Design a protein with these regions (language model features):
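A structural motif
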Residues: 8-12, 45, 89-96
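Alpha-solenoid helical repeat scaffolds
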Residues: 22, 47-48, 129
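An active-site-proximal "capping" alpha-helix that borders the catalytic cofactor pocket
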Residues: 32-47
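Pan-zinc metallopeptidase signature
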Residues: 56, 73-147
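Active-site recognition of the HExxH zinc-binding catalytic motif
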Residues: 10-23, 35-39
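Internal, charge-rich low-complexity segments
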Residues: 47-68
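Short pre-active-site segment immediately N-terminal to the catalytic Zn-binding motif
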Residues: 1-12, 26-30
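Intrinsically disordered, low-complexity regulatory regions associated with ubiquitination proteins
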Residues: 18, 61-82
Length: 147
C-alpha cells in the first residue's frame, strides 16, 4: 500500500465504524464510547496492515475484518482496483511503511484527549478482554464499554 494509503486507510476504518454504528441501529453514544470504538477499529486496521500478528491479534484482526466487511456491505461501499499498490497485493511492506504505521498506532495509543485517547484506551481494554464482537454487543445493549 502506498504510504498515504496507511493514513487514508486508518481514517476510513474510523469513519466506517461510525457508519456501522448508525446502520446497525446503535443508540446515540457518548463521545468517549463512539470515538473510542472508532479509534479501536482504526488501530486494529493499522495493526493488520503492519504486524504479522500473534494468535490473539490474528483473532482480533479477523473480527475487525468481519466488522469492516459488514460496514462495507451495509454502506454499499465499493473498492477500486487502482486503490492498492503492487506491494499491498503481495502483502509486502517497506521498512518505512511499517515505521509509519507504528507511528500512527502510537499517536492513537498516546492521544491525551479524553474523548479520543481515553475512549480508545477503554475500548481497546474491552476488546482485548471480550473481543470485538463481545464489546460491540455490550455497547449496543448498554451504550457503554464492558468493564
Amino acid at each position: 500500500m502506498l504510504c498515504q494509503g496507511l493514513l487514508t486507510g486508518y481514517i476510513l476504518a474510523h469513519e466506517m465504524m461510525h457508519a456501522y454504528l448508525r446502520l446497525k441501529g446503535y443508540r446515540i453514544l457518548s463521545p468517549e464510547v463512539e470515538e473510542g470504538i472508532c479509534q479501536v477499529l482504526a488501530h486494529l486496521w493499522l495493526e493488520s496492515e503492519i504486524v504479522s500478528g500473534s494468535s490473539s491479534s490474528i483473532a482480533t484482526t479477523s473480527e475487525a475484518a468481519a466488522v469492516a466487511a459488514e460496514v462495507a456491505v451495509a454502506a454499499e461501499a465499493t473498492a477500486t482496483p487502482s486503490s492498492t499498490s503492487s506491494s499491498a497485493k503481495k502483502g509486502e511492506k517497506t521498512d518505512f511503511e511499517k515505521k509509519l504505521g507504528e507511528f500512527f498506532k502510537h499517536q492513537i495509543e498516546t492521544d491525551p484527549s479524553a474523548i479520543y485517547g481515553d475512549g480508545f484506551r477503554a475500548g481497546i481494554r474491552a476488546v482485548e478482554r471480550y473481543g470485538l464482537r463481545g464489546t460491540l454487543d455490550h455497547i449496543k445493549r448498554s451504550g457503554s464499554f464492558p468493564s
